[in-house]
């Protein structure tokens, strides 16, 4: 999860394109 969160923080545009809620949540945790 931590790795996915780090990836989410770096690749927010990618997460938006994927529209993956879990990915977005992980990105939010990192920020």
Curated annotation (Swiss-Prot):
GO terms for molecular function: L-malate dehydrogenase (NAD+) activity. Homodimer. This is Malate dehydrogenase, mitochondrial. Its EC number is 1.1.1.37. The keyword NAD applies. Keywords: Mitochondrion, NAD, Oxidoreductase, Tricarboxylic acid cycle. It catalyses: (S)-malate + NAD(+) = oxaloacetate + NADH + H(+). GO terms for biological process: tricarboxylic acid cycle. It is found in: Mitochondrion matrix. Belongs to the LDH/MDH superfamily. MDH type 1 family. Transmembrane segments: none annotated. One of its GO terms (cellular component) is mitochondrial matrix. NAD(+) binds at residues 9-31.
């Amino acid at each position: 999860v931590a790795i996915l969160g780090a990836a989410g923080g770096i690749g927010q545009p990618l997460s938006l394109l994927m529209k993956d809620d879990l990915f977005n949540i992980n990105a939010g945790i990192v920020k």
